[in-house]
Amino acid sequence: MKQLLEFIPLILFFTVYKLYGVQQAAITLVIATVIQLIVLKVLYKKIEKSQWIMGIFAVFFGILTAYFNDLNFLKWKVTIINGLFAAVLLVSQFVFKKPIIQMLLGKELKLPTNVWNRLNLGWAGFFIICMLLNIVISYYFSDDVWATFKTFGFTGLSLIAAIATGVYLYPHLKNVENTNEQA
C-alpha cells in the first residue's frame, strides 16, 4: 500500500497534464503530494527522509512550474533529485567509508562489505544514468515525451534496478542463511 501511495501524485500529474496542461498538472502534483505526506504520516506514523526530500522538492518545483507555467522546473527537479541521491551514495562510500545502503539496511541484511560497496555503487550508477537520461529527454524531446517517460520510463527503470538488486543479492543471502544454519 505504501508503494502505491508513492505513485498516486505521479499518476495524477500525468493524467492532468495530458488532459489540461502544465499549470493544472503542477497544481495537482502539489496538492496530491501534500495529501500523500499527510496520509503517510497518519497511516505509518513516520515519513522516511527520502519521502520528505521528494515531497519538498515536488511541492517547491511544482509551485514554480504552476506559477511560471513552465515544465522546465519539474524537469530540473528530476535531474537534481537523481544527482542528489547519487552524490549521497558516493559520498557515504568514499568520504565516510560506509555505504549509506548498509546504514539503512544493515540491521535486516548481513552482507560482506564488498557486497554493500557494489550495491551502493550500483544504485549510484543507476541514479546517474537516470539523471543523464532526464537531461537528454528534457532537452531533445517534446514535453509530452518527457512527461510520459517520467511517469512510465523511470518507473520501469526503477523496477528493473530493484529486480537486478534482488538477483545480485540472492546468492549472497543464501550464503548468509547457510552460515546462520551452521552456527
Curated annotation (Swiss-Prot):
Transmembrane stretches, start-end: 19-39, 53-73, 76-96, 121-141, 151-171
UniProt topology in membrane: Multi-pass membrane protein
Keyword set, alphabetical order: Cell inner membrane, Cell membrane, Membrane, Transmembrane, Transmembrane helix
UniProt subcellular location: Cell inner membrane
Highest taxon of the lineage: Bacteria
Designated name of the protein: Inner membrane-spanning protein YciB
Disulfide bridges in this chain: none
Family that this chain belongs to: Belongs to the YciB family.
Its biological purpose: Plays a role in cell envelope biogenesis, maintenance of cell envelope integrity and membrane homeostasis.
GO CC annotations on file: plasma membrane
Organism annotation: Actinobacillus pleuropneumoniae serotype 5b (strain L20)
